[in-house]
Amino acid sequence: MEELEKDKIERNEEMSEEVKGEGPPSELEQSEEVVEEKIETEVEQKKEPSLEEIVEELRKKLEEKEKEAKEYLDIAQRIKAEFDNYRKRTEKEKAEMISYGQEQVIIELLPVIDNFERALANEGDYNSLREGLELIYRQFKKVLDKFEVREIEAEGQMFDPYKHHALAQEEVEGKQPNEIIEVFQKGYYLKDKVIRPSLVKVAK
């Protein structure tokens, strides 16, 4: 009787052990399962795209680049057209300004020519002719002044190759070397620009 009771107790203990083994998974087991699922998910996400997908992606990128290139080309063409129009407009304005400037000079010189003709037509004496020529000279000088044309100072000045051209040299007592001692032809400025240098003789 005692042996039967002992066997029963042993079987109950074994069943208890089995029941314990079949209980809920431990935290370690749960963590391992989560890690395995995460790895499987990442592997699926990192799956290499197919050839068709690669081709489609490249086609889309190519279309985008072609669209950008067309936009840049349109911009470049518009800028070129605007620049061409600007260049033509400025060239026309420049030509008109030159033409207008020439016209103004001619208009200012016409009275000088008129007075020359009157002086030449005058059959009076030499003094009258001289007075007429002096009048014309003063009138012509006023025209030059109006257009900011000035004589270049030369005689008594030191030679300056930017304003003077030396045609001759001569030893002159009391004169410094390269001092201008004679002017063969006057030079002129237009504003601050030398439009004709003076032709001079300088001392040695």
Curated annotation (Swiss-Prot):
UniProt xrefs under CDD domains: GrpE
Keyword terms: Chaperone, Cytoplasm, Stress response
Annotated localization: Cytoplasm
Region ranges (Disordered): 1-46
GO cellular component, one term: cytoplasm
InterPro entries for this protein: GrpE, GrpE_coiled_coil, GrpE_head
Function: Participates actively in the response to hyperosmotic and heat shock by preventing the aggregation of stress-denatured proteins, in association with DnaK and GrpE. It is the nucleotide exchange factor for DnaK and may function as a thermosensor. Unfolded proteins bind initially to DnaJ; upon interaction with the DnaJ-bound protein, DnaK hydrolyzes its bound ATP, resulting in the formation of a stable complex. GrpE releases ADP from DnaK; ATP binding to DnaK triggers the release of the substrate protein, thus completing the reaction cycle.
Subunit structure: Homodimer.
Protein name: Protein GrpE
Organism: Caldanaerobacter subterraneus subsp. tengcongensis (strain DSM 15242 / JCM 11007 / NBRC 100824 / MB4) (Thermoanaerobacter tengcongensis)
